[in-house]
C-alpha cells in the first residue's frame, strides 16, 4: 500500500460569513495542493458555523450549499487534489436541513456522500438525521477504499465496523467538537475532558479497526470552548500528527498505509469479522 500526503485544515468558521469562509477555505486547499498533498480535509460546518442560536436567518443561507459544493469540485479538478469539504448544512426543497459531507476526487468527481446519523443534541431540533435503514457506506477513491463519519459519530464504534466490513482503509471525520460539549458538570470534573475523549477515541478507532483515522476539527478561541486537536492516527503507532491547540492552521501529514496491513496481520480483526459465524451480528 502507498503513502498518502493528507492536509488537515483546522479552520475557524466565522459565524454566518459563508462567502468569506469559502474564500479562506479555497486558499488553504490551494496551499495544500502546492505542498504536494493528495487530499485536503476541512471540518464540519466549515462555511456557516451552523449554530442556530447565532442567527435564525442562517437557515435560508443553507439553501446555497450546492453552489459551494460545485465550486469545490471545480477546485479539486483544477488543483489535482482530492477534497473533503468538511460538511454542509443543506437546506432542501422539503424544508429539511441535513448535515452532509462529500469526498471529491482529483478530477472533480464526487466519489461518496454521507449524511450524519448521530446528531449532537443541539442539532436535533434543526437538522434531520439520515434514515435508520441506510447503512454507512465505503467507496472507492484514488486513495483506496474510504469511509466517512461526522463528529459525534466518532463516539459509536458500530459506524466504523460497518465501514471496515466493506473494506474501508481510511475513515475521515470532519468535526465541530468543543470542550464545552462536556456540559457544565463535565467541565467541573475536567475542563479538558473532551480532549481526553478525542485523543482516546481517534486512536482507539484506528487500532480496533486496523484503519487510518483522519480527524479534522474546527479552530477557534479556546476561551469560547474550542478544542481543535485535529489529528491523524494509525494502528501500532497511534497519533502520528496532531494540533496541540485550537488555533487555525494546516498540517500536511505523511500517512504510511502499509502499517494497516502489518496491523491486520497481527490482530486479524478484519479476518475475524469476515467469518460466517461472526458472533456480534454486524451487517454484511
List PLM regions with ranges.
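Short loop/turn motifs at secondary-structure junctions and domain boundaries
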Residues: 91-96, 221-225
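Short beta->alpha transition motifs characteristic of CBS
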Residues: 48, 102, 114-120, 231, ...
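Short beta-strand scaffold segments in enzyme catalytic cores
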Residues: 85-87, 100-103, 137, 230-232, ...
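Extreme N-terminal starter segment of soluble prokaryotic enzymes
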Residues: 2-8
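Short polar catalytic/cofactor-binding loops
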Residues: 10-16
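Active-site beta-strand/loop signature of hydrolases that rely on acidic residues for catalysis
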Residues: 21, 29-58, 76, 83-84, ...
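Active-site catalytic loop in hydrolytic enzyme cores
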Residues: 92-201, 262-273
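CN hydrolase (nitrilase-like) catalytic-core segments centered on the catalytic cysteine
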Residues: 64-84, 155-250
Amino acid at each position: 500500500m502507498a503513502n498518502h500526503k493528507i492536509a488537515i485544515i483546522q479552520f475557524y468558521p466565522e459565524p454566518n460569513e459563508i462567502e468569506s469562509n469559502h474564500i479562506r477555505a479555497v486558499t488553504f486547499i490551494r496551499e495544500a495542493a502546492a505542498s504536494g498533498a493528495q487530499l485536503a480535509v476541512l471540518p464540519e460546518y466549515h462555511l456557516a458555523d451552523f449554530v442556530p442560536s447565532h442567527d435564525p436567518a442562517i437557515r435560508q443561507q443553507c439553501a446555497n450549499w450546492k453552489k459551494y459544493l460545485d465550486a469545490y469540485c471545480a477546485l479539486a479538478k483544477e488543483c489535482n487534489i482530492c477534497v473533503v469539504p468538511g460538511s454542509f448544512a443543506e437546506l432542501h426543497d422539503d424544508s429539511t436541513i441535513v448535515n452532509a459531507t462529500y469526498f471529491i476526487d482529483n478530477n472533480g468527481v464526487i466519489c461518496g456522500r454521507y449524511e450524519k446519523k448521530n446528531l449532537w443534541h443541539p442539532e436535533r431540533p434543526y437538522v434531520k438525521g439520515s434514515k435508520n435503514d441506510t447503512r454507512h457506506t465505503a467507496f472507492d477513491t484514488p486513495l483506496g477504499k474510504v469511509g466517512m463519519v461526522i463528529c459525534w459519530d466518532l463516539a459509536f464504534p458500530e459506524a466504523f465496523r460497518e465501514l471496515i466490513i466493506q473494506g474501508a482503509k481510511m475513515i475521515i471525520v470532519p468535526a465541530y467538537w468543543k470542550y464545552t460539549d462536556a456540559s457544565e458538570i463535565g467541565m467541573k470534573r475536567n475542563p479538558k475532558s473532551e480532549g481526553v475523549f478525542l485523543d482516546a477515541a481517534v486512536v482507539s478507532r484506528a487500532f480496533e479497526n486496523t484503519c487510518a483515522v483522519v480527524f479534522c476539527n474546527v479552530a477557534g478561541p479556546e476561551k469560547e470552548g474550542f478544542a481543535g486537536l485535529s489529528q491523524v492516527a494509525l494502528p501500532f503507532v497511534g497519533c502520528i500528527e496532531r494540533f496541540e491547540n485550537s488555533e487555525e492552521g494546516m498540517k500536511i501529514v505523511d500517512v504510511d498505509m502499509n502499517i494497516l496491513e502489518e496491523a491486520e496481520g497481527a490482530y486479524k480483526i478484519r479476518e475475524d469479522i469476515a467469518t460466517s459465524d461472526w458472533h456480534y451480528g454486524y451487517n454484511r
